[in-house]
Design a protein with these regions (language model features):
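Glycine-rich, flexible loop/turn motifs
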Residues: 15, 80, 112-115
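Generic beta-strand structural signal
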Residues: 22-24, 61, 90-92
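C-terminal helix-cap and adjacent tail motif
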Residues: 90-119
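Glycine-rich, charged/polar anion/phosphate-binding loops
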Residues: 10-13, 78-80, 103
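Short, electropositive alpha-helical surface patch
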Residues: 78-91
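Glycine/small-residue-rich phosphate/adenosyl-binding loop
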Residues: 1-47
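Small-aliphatic-rich amphipathic alpha-helix that forms the alpha element of a beta-alpha
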Residues: 26, 32-81
């Protein structure tokens, strides 16, 4: 991963430590299949939705979950590490572990009208 990020020395060690923060790291990969009815982009959206649903299910089961992405997710070196086929794309990683003992504060509610529109 450090190679994919172009890091060396202490920066590479810092990245390696971050990758070991969670006891379980799941790679989220889309493997699109040729289909006249379901284009590649839609297959990627479905894979993302499945990963999100998995993160919600893990959270509901009491696990802490964080979806991580970054420039490394699309790097050739990372694709080699994950042994992805030429048509496969890494969408990111789900870091799974224990939840913090307590949440700090309460989230500020958002105003849905600031983010949604109607046709």
């Amino acid at each position: 991963m450090a190679d994919a990020a172009g890091l060396t020395g202490s920066a590479a060690e810092t990245l390696a430590a971050k990758l070991r923060r969670a006891p379980l790291v799941l790679a989220i990969v889309v493997s699109p299949k040729p289909s006249p009815k379901v284009p590649d982009w839609e297959q990627e959206v479905v894979a993302s939705g499945v990963a999100h649903a998995l993160s919600l299910a893990l959270d509901e089961a009491g696990w802490g979950v964080m979806w991580r992405t970054g420039l490394q997710a699309r790097a050739d070196a990372v694709h080699r590490i994950h042994q992805l086929a030429p048509n496969e794309r890494l969408l990111g990683w789900l870091y799974v572990g224990a939840k913090p003992a307590s949440k700090s504060g309460r989230r500020t509610p958002i105003k849905a009208k600031d983010y949604l529109t109607a046709l």
